[in-house]
């Protein structure tokens, strides 16, 4: 049947149909190949925006650096990074005047955090540039490698477990004349296989010691590795994102802690809150502007867009802001906070993997690593790539590009928000000293500006003044991409405001469906997503009921667990039918065991096992949730688990769902192909680390893993704990004398082995 799609919208107000224009159904685009080209674009663009700055050379690394601060005032609308220090400082002073004590109080809060944060804070986060191996690794591994190298070079402050002490080590490491590191490498040999008599390639993983001189070490410590940002919807071109190494991360964390604390106190800041809290905050600002624009005033709102926010920001400006915000604080605190921006003004961008070349005629493929771009003959490249390489060559050192101006993506979201809000703050009548005034919202690079004035000329004058003020702080509002409306209709961080926020449901679409973790988690996450959308996103009861039915259908197809009385044949249907026939109370079977679905929109908050518990056969209960059943996963039985949801925009959200450990909460095994690669050494280290921690947990069950305090090592702590426990168990008659003696003997053997070692 043909349906005219416009009929669907006859009864829908136009603003509610906004969802349908969003590119959020289907798979998002992923990037393939290397990010080298995108990174060169970023580096070249950033330098172009600041080209009228002053060139200097870094005395330690020899890197050429461009400093656009206090550069020429712009004469046209082209984006530029020439922020003026005195203007930034003045904006900060006015921000403090409007919010008395804001910096002081935030500094005090941050100082407490600095003294309490443990170094394991840095294990959060995904891929991190590991400077010891010169490539990306999971954050925990990169941290472990860094600490190990520090230890082997005589830096041990970090062993206290405080992040601040680890940062002291980082500072010390930069003064050293050389650093010894261990790197993994691969050897390939062609050998004949005894069984098949074919030639095969054997790979062996070796570790070799390497010494880095001061210059090479500094380059690595200041390096941001780059990758292509994946899964960006609604864009044709990909772009590069950066991942910093462990030396930089800790310092950035403390700066962002201070900035976050400030943002929490600013009503115009869209960070760090999210969701409904953010909407409430925004609605307040709009309400204030609407009520104050009495009948005599006009009120207009700009849905704002900034050109290349990151590439025009400047770490030197952030240094000025931090210096101002911490001006009455102790010296050590000011020093800790000023290191991040200093490191960023000396940062190096790693160009990624390099380029792949293939010759169609000779069926040859070869990789040109980034390190070779400085010297290779350019005749092999096409025009656009040739231009990029020529432009970037003067900046190259050891395969990385010197990138002093600009702030790669996502590094100082909070601090740059403070900068943006400081301009919104200047819109008060006591600062504009005229008939127009403005206010607005800022969230990282996204903003909405509300301007009030008696007439259209006043509105225009207000917008112009805002635009020029932004230019002075290195912010470039895009005149092409920003648009203005009567207040009451605007968009901010993909929230659409039309006399109140309209649910933009399309953005939640990617999180519907089966997540693919395991049968237990997937069921729980699926119904939780539907429940959350009924609460937050105007998902009505009828649609929710339909979403639920579609989800159950999807779930059954994914896990091949159609009802026991169905005709559908799958690999599992034989087992499921057998279970169905021998089950007295069929309603008690979980959906994943071929049972019926008992969910409706009223009971989405109850985990399925609890929902059906009373209906289950006793022996089924015993199999499903019995701790003695080897198939019941007991990694940790917490009532809440976290799933990482990827909403359509913004960072991955943590979503809580109820977790009941059953035979269905299995954990998939790691892909074996990793075992044949150079990652294998890393994997073995990781497993070793895991085993030690698990063992430690067994001895100190209540411990969330913290290094035992005092001088004892982990082994000594475990041995002494074992002795105490054994004695208590022996005296209370829980264990026999033989067992007690055996435990004591083992403890002594362990100590003896340690002494010999």
From Swiss-Prot:
* UniProt catalytic activity: RNA(n) + a ribonucleoside 5'-triphosphate = RNA(n+1) + diphosphate
Q: What ranges does the record give for the region Disordered, renumbered to this chain?
A: 53-82
Per the Swiss-Prot or TrEMBL annotation, the motif Nuclear localization signal is positioned at 187-195, 203-216
Task: Name the top EC class.
Answer: transferase
Q: Where is the composition biased (Polar residues)?
A: 55-64
| Subunit | Influenza RNA polymerase is composed of three subunits: PB1, PB2 and PA. Interacts (via N-terminus) with PA (via C-terminus). Interacts (via C-terminus) with PB2 (via N-terminus); this interaction is essential for transcription initiation. Interacts (via C-terminus) with human PKP2 (via N-terminus); the interaction competitively inhibits the interaction between the RNA polymerase subunits PB1 and PB2.
Q: What is this protein called?
A: RNA-directed RNA polymerase catalytic subunit
Q: What is the originating organism of this protein? A: Influenza A virus (strain A/Puerto Rico/8/1934 H1N1)
